[in-house]
Amino acid sequence: MTDLTGGFGVDFSFTSCAFASATYVERNAQLCHMVEHNLPLLGIDNAKVVCADAVDYLSTLDMQTMIFLDPARRDQHGAKTVMLADCTPDVVQLLPQLLKKSRFTMLKLSPMLDWHKAVEDLQGTVREVHIVSVGGECKELLLVLSEEIESELKVFCADLEAGDSSLSGGSSGSSCSSLSSEPSFPRTPSSPSASSTPSLSASLFVYAPGSSCPAPNSKLKTQNSKFLHEPNASIMKAGCFDELAAAYGVSPVSRNSHLFLSAEPVDGFPGRSFSIERVTTLNKRELRQALAGIEKANIATRNFPLSVAELRKRLKLKDGGDVYIFATTTAEDEHLLLISHKYQ
């Protein structure tokens, strides 16, 4: 494999372990010297360091199993860019060469990027999209390109948390089609030094955009639901709400709420689940009864006319505690507060 945007060598030090030989390419000579010094210390003896421009070196490459690129996300003035064509190097312009020179090309992109637009810009060559979140925040967007393998596009939504190294949430979350959760490109084996790094637990949901999914169950009403489910950051970035509802048998509160309901607990839901204790409108009398005994709460708004700060001021509640209040608007255009506690 070849990493054409080597940088500090962090990505390279992990990906290189999955290949018999690996090449680090970086035009900054100082970084090249640093990585050349660090690789033996990391126990990586299958790699070579090349100080060269990525575009120039690409033209000299023989066929590779994988080419990795993490294009610079700032323009010549230092401003952040989120459009694929504005990154350096321009992978859209380099696409024909990348496909010709490798079985797989992996792009590491800004989580702010519109991945649907990126897939479109890359002209049907994207085989996999990996959306990776850590601790509730979307951190990375990875695209895997190939002309060699013709298959439907798969989207992997991964959410990582510090903990044990188990995988929860099911290997393939989508019931819309029979999908394998295994990526089609080589995976990095465990590093010898893995024991020195924090272990992770991960929730994984896999789906195929455009697959025929059953319509989400909208019969379940907010007022008589017992459980509330909030998708994780990767699901939110993917926007796969119909697929999620079909896979787990949950009902959307409304089209734009991105909250889901169920009458029973849902095992392995990729996100947070809550038990609903009370449901109230903004009617003063109802609010007084529903909030009796509650002095502080964690408040979130989803498709709701008030901000969190405005609602907190109106409810006169402090921040924190074990009560969670979700303010949202139902499909019937009714503003409701769902007062809940974390489930398990």
What are these regions (language model features)?
Residues M1-Q344:
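SAM-dependent transferase fold signal centered on methyltransferase-like domains
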